[in-house]
Amino acid sequence: WISGFTGSAGTAVILMDKAGLWTDSRYFLQATKELEGSDITLYKEMLPETPSITEFLCQHLKPGESVSIDGKMFSVQQVEQMKEELAAHQLQVDIFGDPLSSIWKNRPAMPDSPAFIYDIKYAGKSCEEKISAIRTELKKKGVYALFISALDEIAWTLNLRGNDVHCNPVIVSYLLITQDEVTYFISPEKVTAEVETYLKERQIGIQKYDE
């Protein structure tokens, strides 16, 4: 919305006097065309002459200034690395929610197509078997919990499918697996009575997507 770029992978950086969009080689041609005529500069990732996002910020911001990010869009590791690199230039990272929510008035709603069960004869293994295998690996690594945000991994783990992404049978959701419980974060309207029963029978808790 803010750039006009329609590719599936990219990061926009908006400063008071300039803006940039970082994307990978899959979208160089597309982004060049879609950003044409805008005030947004395309930065082609992985090319030697392209500054990283933090390098760009350090070049154009003054010590003491802050960088705001949507915490939902970055992993903990990414945030920690960003904080470390920016702190070296006396820049601060502030983590907020979605910065566009108050200005994008006609934003399309989240997809709400219902989830459905993927038959075991196609899945090969039950979700109980898969969760057990995940917990075994967590124990080996001395890890208590695994938070899964990759939609294909969630679909595989739970043997659930959906229609939230064009040509990709996944469901917009999150999954938290600990040694003691499993919690599935999903919009309530996606959960049919059949899916709710399926999850409860497997001791999988259900929470709202934005909890």
Where are these regions (language model features)?
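N-terminal accessory/capping or targeting/presequence segment of soluble
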Residues: W1-K62, S66, F74, Q78-E211
